[in-house]
Amino acid sequence: MTGSMASSAPTSSAAKNDSVVTAAVLVIGDEILSGRTKDKNIGYIADFLTDIGIDLKEVRIVPDEEPEIVAAVNALRSRYTYLFTTGGIGPTHDDITAECVAKAFGVALEHHPQAVEIMRARLAQTGGEMNEARMRMTRVPKGATLVLNKISAAPGFWIGNVIVMAGIPSVMQAMLDYVAPQLKTGAKMLSQSIRADCREGDIGTELGAIAKTHADVVIGSYPFVDEKNLANTNVVVRSRDPQKLTAAKVAIEAMLTRVKAGLAKA
């Protein structure tokens, strides 16, 4: 897809379907990589997408460097149904996401008339000046559609399958709400959690065997320290098929009963 022109965002709500819809998140910013700013967006986006039937498959964090951003945009947009980016659309010299996305798509960067109008209207209310820095925030790649929000006058944008959002969590969340009705969504991933009441090492082999016989189900084990300060495990079973989910859950519960009975005799 590198260097090709893509259509702008759809203008009507997308219907749900039974196919798998995937996404990646690209976090842009030196401040994240340096540790100065702690990311608060990845987990929110993951929960949001899961709830509407989109599988988040990959997350990358890149610095404010054009080659890194362009390469990541092209790699991720070609691999997944959607790419969501956060950060780098502010008024300063190091906010270069718009330029980089335009370069990735091989199109010009231009001031969007609606973005300029929104910015001027907000500044008229606040008494601010429409200066060069604020004009930077009205630039989008040619052909992009604005991603509006109720919090900030500065919009994000959507071009092809790339949705560019702010890094500020409250603004990002408002932008995500704005685009959600237009996203293609798939069948939701169902999930069940089972408390094992034994250590992960006690069930690892048996759990692996169950995973092999239930190949259409994702099975994960997550150790934790319980309220008695003992090593414990949560087993999480995930599938789009409720019957397959139930079958795997029953098999795991039966295995746990056997294992715990054996441990009690030891």
Question: Where are the regions a protein language model picked out?
Answer:
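N-terminal amphipathic/basic leader segments beginning at the initiator methionine
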Residues: 1-22
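Glycine-rich phosphate/diphosphate-binding loop of Rossmann-like nucleotide-binding domains
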Residues: 17-59, 63-64, 243-250
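Glycine-rich beta-strand-to-loop/alpha-helix junction loops that act as flexible
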Residues: 28-30, 85-93, 167, 222, ...
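N-terminal small/polar loop signature for handling phosphorylated ligands or for N-terminal nucleophile
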Residues: 43-96, 103, 124
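Short beta->alpha linker loops
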Residues: 61-64, 114, 135, 198
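Proline/glycine-rich low-complexity loops and linkers
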Residues: 68-74, 95-186
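An accessory alpha-helical subdomain
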Residues: 161-255
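Conserved short beta-strand edge segments in small beta-sheet-based binding/regulatory domains
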Residues: 255-266
